[in-house]
């Protein structure tokens, strides 16, 4: 079973969580499915209104805990990661803007994260990083400088470490 934490208008989970039902400047994504920026919770399968830092689920419930572009908005990203690990049986997947791209994407991002932050946080809560990827966008070349790539998005995949 998959849970999507911070699902917004594009839920992918069997269970989908978001804190904001009303319109919010934090929301992005495909809003063509709705008349306004409110979440249409009737169209979202198994919708639960909850804070990503305090998820109302038992431990070890979901096979995959997924979150896309939510962790940069929460006040305590470490607590969010810890909660995602708590409710996960095994795998956690997080996507977010890279710290160097974050200010260009939305000024409402309260966290500017990078892979090193995720690696340190994972170690503290006994998660193992099994995949890390930074996608980039390229600037338009100027006649005097070559094409430059800038980090844009991080995708991290973790598994719970086996307890000894």
Language model feature labels by segment:
Residues 38-43, 47, 75-164:
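S-adenosyl-L-methionine-dependent methyltransferase catalytic module, highlighting the catalytic core
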Residues 1-100, 156-160:
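Conserved SAM-binding loop
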